[in-house]
Swiss-Prot record:
It comes from Shewanella woodyi (strain ATCC 51908 / MS32). NCBIfam families: recf. The keyword Transcription does not apply. It is found in: Cytoplasm. ATP binds at residues 30-37. InterPro entries: DNA-binding_RecF (IPR001238), DNA-binding_RecF_CS (IPR018078), P-loop_NTPase (IPR027417), RecF/RecN/SMC_N (IPR003395), RecF_2 (IPR042174). This is DNA replication and repair protein RecF. It holds the Pfam family SMC_N.
């Protein structure tokens, strides 16, 4: 799966751009502020309906316009899909796939699975559990079609339950919601656990390449003691939850834990090793997607040279290319990428002041 055409209009500092990317490695280079990261951001926006740099859509729309427009042709083997998105300054989003209006942004994510590696990516290991749950849930969403609705039901019931807790109602008025919460929570947890187990198998081989002297253990925590019946726990913790005004245990508290020996990876590994670990997680997730669905992710890699030394830059690029996925990499100096490859990039683009120009024949300097 790959983008064969990308049209960007009034997106950040790009007034209008038309790209015809290769299905291999696409190198996008230019000075800071030129708009090269905006190209990656536009692809992400097209697949997720939001930016990886800002949740405020108004900031990505050029100030003199009231909307942004993104359009792409997507090759799926012998089939081709067309995806179009408009985001208005009012916040309204209009999405079409093959001419049909789409109401749910989750349909975009299913159609265009995207992996992002940026200088901020390793915050996955330092931020709270929410970002790691989102990482798990990206994979769970793609691996099991029942996950999206089950997790939506969990969130809906939790919202209702928390409101009842704040109103300090009797437990008998909450019991019905607890039964529903248990039912959907067990399904969500099962899908998450199975996904993490499968991801762990993919991750082992990649970590051997990236961190050969380190043994990283990955485990999934469900958000409550696995030896405890969740329904009984909700009843037992009812008074505590009333006092807090929210539900203290459940799948909304799940986490992905990574350790070296008895230490969290944050305490055991260097900053450079942590970056490599996050890259390994993203590659493993993409490989697992391919194994489970026969669909490749599209990889967006921003500012790679500043994050890794030459040896590990070469190793990461080779691992990415071995996935067979379409890759977009940005850099200030194209030589830093070209010199790390055994063969030149499939296609190169130069970006200057929001203007994107294709470089037909990439060569080593």
């Amino acid at each position: 799966m790959s983008l064969t055409r990308l049209h960007i209009e009034t997106f950040r500092n790009i007034s209008s751009a038309q790209l015809h990317p290769s299905d291999g490695l696409n190198l996008i280079y230019g000075q800071n502020g030129s708009g090269k990261t905006s190209v990656l951001e536009a692809i992400y926006f097209l697949g997720m309906g939001r930016s990886f740099r800002s949740h405020l859509s108004q900031r990505v729309i050029q100030h003199q316009d009231d909307k942004l427009t993104l359009f792409a042709n997507l090759s799926l083997g012998e089939q081709e899909s067309k995806i179009g998105l408009r985001r208005f300054r009012s916040g309204e989003t209009e999405v079409k796939i093959n001419g049909d209006k789409i109401k749910r942004l989750s349909t975009l994510a299913e159609t265009l699975p995207i992996q992002v590696i940026t200088p901020e990516s390793f915050s996955l290991l330092f931020e709270g559990p929410k970002s790691r749950r989102q990482f798990i849930d990206w994979g769970a969403f793609h691996s099991d079609k029942s996950f999206h609705s089950a997790w939506a039901n969990v969130k809906r019931i939790l919202k209702q339950r928390n409101q009842l807790l704040k109103n300090q109602v009797s437990y008998s008025q909450i019991q019905f919601w607890d039964k529903e919460l248990v039912r959907y929570s067990e399904l969500v947890t099962l899908i998450r656990k199975e996904y993490v187990d499968s991801l762990n198998e993919q991750l082992k081989g990649i970590i051997v390449e990236f961190l050969p002297q380190v043994e990283v253990k990955v485990s999934f925590t469900r958000g409550w003691d696995s030896k405890t019946d969740f329904g009984q726990l909700l009843e037992t913790q009812y008074l505590r939850d009333v006092a807090a005004g929210n539900t203290g245990s459940g799948p909304h508290k799940a986490d992905l834990r990574l350790r070296v020996g008895t230490l969290p990876v944050q305490d055991a590994l260097s900053r450079g090793q942590l970056k490599l670990l996050v890259c390994a997680l993203r590659i493993a997730q993409g490989k697992l997607l391919k194994q489970q669905t026969d669909k490749n992710s599209i990889y967006l890699v921003d500012d790679l040279p500043s994050e890794l030394d030459a040896k590990h830059r070469q190793l990461l690029l080779q691992q990415l290319m071995d996935t067979g996925a379409q890759i977009f990499v940005t850099a200030i100096d194209p030589a830093a990428i070209v010199d790390s490859l055994t063969t030149p990039p499939s296609k190169m683009f130069h970006v200057e002041q929001g203007c994107v120009t294709v470089i037909d024949k990439p060569t080593r300097e």
